[in-house]
A protein has these predicted regions:
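C-terminal amphipathic/interface module of NAD(P)-dependent oxidoreductases
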Residues: 229-270
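NAD(P)-dependent short-chain dehydrogenase/reductase
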Residues: 141-189
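Glycine-rich NAD(P)-binding loop of the Rossmann-fold in SDR/ketoreductase-type enzymes
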Residues: 49, 78-89, 130, 134-137, ...
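SDR active-site strand-loop-helix element
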Residues: 6, 30, 64-68, 103-109, ...
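Conserved Rossmann-fold NAD(P)-dependent oxidoreductase catalytic core, especially the SDR/UDP-sugar
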Residues: 88-131
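Mid/C-terminal beta-alpha module of Rossmann-like enzyme folds, strongest
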Residues: 194-241, 245-246
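N-terminal Rossmann NAD(P)H-binding glycine-rich loop of SDR-like oxidoreductase domains
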Residues: 3-23
């Protein structure tokens, strides 16, 4: 099996790629720079806006894992260009050059409504107003109507393997999150486990939420990495915001190896 991985040099991709290689997956990457890659990985130079590079990248692959995305920028045009137009280009290249390939797209828990009455479910109506989740939802819809063999994995707050993401909460959380807000979480190990299940066809034709077993308060997360946050007993605007219902994933066979962020801390996996 040869798999194309986009976003291989990003936060998730740099941790997923070596795990795929260790699992015996032959990997190809779409990269712009000269970042070091694991032995045996075949780089294709280019990006999601280059038709020639995309054709070369997808030709001969059995599957595509599409991680590449733009977020945490004020450049909304860039968000839409990369997340929607780039995804659309990759889908078109796959239709033309690898129509039987399995296409796995990474997406986000931010798609779910701010005022949800329960943890986000895959079949909930979604109409996000922020550009990042709105662009990801638009890309999801492009894939779902493409005629390809697709699956979509929605991830919540990703952490672990010393990626620095938890540490960033010490700067991001104050003023943005209520300290009692609980976030669904997923460790990089379990992203890899979900990706391998997707490559085997477990999630074909489905949107699937992938998270661990214990949404954790922002207050606890900040303290876990040595930060501090002003406590509050004020009511939460919506206690379900950024939480996901993962019942479907469990029914389909996904079980997180890292069940909680506290387990990760105890096992030095942060």
């Amino acid at each position: 099996m040869t798999v194309l991985l986009t976003g291989a040099t990003g936060l998730v991709g740099t941790r997923l790629l070596p795990r795929l290689v260790a699992h015996g997956v032959r990997c190809r990457t779409l990269v712009r720079g000269d970042n070091p890659l694991p032995d045996g990985v075949d780089p294709v130079r280019g990006d999601l806006l280059e038709a020639g590079a995309l054709a070369a990248a997808v030709t001969g692959v059995s599957a595509i894992i599409h991680l590449a995305a733009t977020f945490r920028t004020t450049d909304t045009d860039l968000i839409w260009k990369n997340n929607l137009e780039g995804s659309r280009n990759l889908i078109a290249a796959t239709q033309a050059n690898a129509p039987r390939a399995r296409f796995i797209m990474a997406s986000t828990a931010w798609i779910y409504a701010d005022d949800a009455e329960h943890p986000g479910r895959e079949d909930d109506p979604a109409a996000p107003t922020l550009d990042y989740p709105a662009s990801k939802l638009a890309a999801e819809n492009e894939l779902r109507s493409s005629g390809l063999n697709w699956s979509i994995l929605r991830f919540p707050f990703v952490y672990g393997d010393k990626d620095g993401h938890l540490e960033s909460l010490t700067q991001l959380a104050p003023g943005r999150f209520h300290p009692a807000q609980r976030l669904s979480m997923v460790h990089h190990r379990d992203i890899a486990a979900a990706a391998i299940l997707a490559l085997d066809g477990t999630f074909d034709g489905r949107i699937v939420n992938i998270a661990d077993e214990a949404p954790t308060s922002v207050y606890e997360l900040v303290e876990l990495v040595g930060g501090s946050m002003e406590p509050s007993s004020k009511p939460l605007t919506n206690p379900w915001h950024i939480q996901m219902d993962c019942s479907l994933a469990r029914r389909l066979g996904f079980q997180p190896e890292v069940r909680t962020v506290h387990q990760a801390a105890q096992q030095d996996l942060l």
